[in-house]
Amino acid sequence: MAEAQSRMRVLWWGTYDPENPRVKILQQGLQSNGVEIVRCHRAIWGAQTKTQMTRFLKVWKILRCFCSYPRLVFCFFTAPKSEAVVVSHLGLLDLFVLWPFSRVRGVTIVWDAFISLYDTVIFDRKMAPEGGVAARLLWGLEYLACRMADCIVLDTRAHADYFAQTFRLPPEKIKVIHVGAEPSVFPLTTAEHFNDTEEFIVLFYGTFIPLHGIDTILDAARLAEGLPWKWVIIGKGQKDGRLRAELAAHQRGNIEWIPWVDYSELSLWMDRANVCLGIFGDTGKAARVIPNKVFQILSKGKPLITRDSPAVRELLSENEGVVLIPPADAKALVEAVKKKQSLWKEFHLYHKVVREKILPEYLGKQFLNLLQIRKS
């Protein structure tokens, strides 16, 4: 009975996407460490927020968001008392609604910010000018949101330093928990699924946002024409226009583009690949984050080529299964594949040590320690 009474309870509150890998990994990790999770959730966002939405759909999503808050507030007050309430990304508006009510109940707010909307919209995707009204508004909203949260969680130390400097925060307010991967969705590759043909498969998947560096991958594929490599590119998004134009203008026999694959099927494509690609963008954000795909590649035990950065160095260094290259450098990407081609032609598993540090249980223990410190 005493053990049941001492079990920590956390309220997960807001309009987050429950299928987002970050959310699933943190929730699973906490539960595996004995934490009870109570969910107060209204579905607003989903896969379309990461690809393309029509203007009507964007307006509809915003309207749904505002209409959801009365129910979420009611849920907050009727939910059992928790040691902390967690707000996941995209949780900017959630914080503004939750903050006054959290003060009434005396509950600690932990914001898993994950990304800066200001950085993403203004500097990474360049959807509005620096110094413009939209930029100042987004900065102001995030500045205030950072002060509403009692603790902010980010995915890398480099990202945490950016938040501290940009939004003028004390460093001790920000904690770091890596993204991790779902081993049930991205299990280790087995020899029977591995590509054993004469074709050497270089795999990239993503939503073609600037930090992915799709232009670098296409330039590398062009430079590698005539070599026995197939570049399999899965996905679509903001920068797929270059890929469409490339395939329309030239007969690229070494590129296979698959616009969409179900999330659950990505692992099968990774099984067949000789090497998987991370990111190659040269934006500031690309240097501060380690994207989901890198953790998923590590979880599969597959060889990885990605851009070098302060963020990735927090987790990885070069070895037989990892090559780090300068950002936006197509020639370096081609040379990296050439250098490792003979090794990666054969079946090997890599990243044994680091895999243990990206499991949900490991990350959940870090999150639990953070919550216990806040509680004490």
Residue ranges, per PLM feature:
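Conserved acidic donor-binding segment of nucleotide-sugar-dependent glycosyltransferases
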Residues: 318-329, 337-344
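Nucleotide-sugar-dependent
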Residues: 212, 262-269, 276-298, 305-314
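Conserved donor-binding/catalytic core segment of Leloir-type glycosyltransferases
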Residues: 194-222, 232
